[in-house]
Amino acid sequence: TPTCTLEKNNFSIKFYTPTVNIKALVDTMFVAEPETIEWIGEFEKGEIFLDVGANIGLYSLWATVSKGVRCFSFEPESLNFSILNRNIFYNNLVDKVTAYPLAVSDQVGFDFLHLSVFESGESCHSFASNKNFADQEFVPAFSQGSFSTTIDHLVETSMIPTPNHIKIDVDGIENKVINGARKILERPELKSMLIEINDDLPCDSEVKEILKDLGFILTSAPPSVLAPVKSVHNIICRR
């Protein structure tokens, strides 16, 4: 079985690496988004971390192993979800990381997840719309049946505790995730969020205004050195 072990700061995590793409994701984890690693470094043991758009679980596992948080990961794409669970299994984290094969947006219900490419470790998929992170229509390589929930619904039905930290990386529907979390965003237990946004999209400008109005202080990170589009970058929001 192809695996590799990532070691940093006396922590080690075993990842399943069935493809060259996935091996590259693991190998570049600490250089692709250094601000994400730095942000995770602010977490405290026992806090609740919600990872929306977890992919194969790089940040879910790093936060859990390095900071001792309780993590809930959401990844609707079938191939990535399979690898995410294998990574949880390999690291004996079943009590610390729970993964759900769900999209998170502003609706609770069934729809399609439109895939940009049908390969594990890939991203730029879109739930309930075939528009990418640049708001451009694309022809899906595959449309997978999927189910969406909202952050408000998850917390209000006691599926998950109120999160202390949320990462949202969903390639274009970040605004929908925020709109489906309006009640939870007002809770003081929520300390911080990291959200991928596109400066060229009006809906993402709206997201920033909503968060400022709720009392979050926003810090912009530069685009990833690996990012194909330089208007896309992370913002970190702290109370």
Residue positions per predicted region:
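Conserved Rossmann-like nucleotide-binding pocket used by diverse enzymes
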Residues: 50, 72, 100, 147, ...
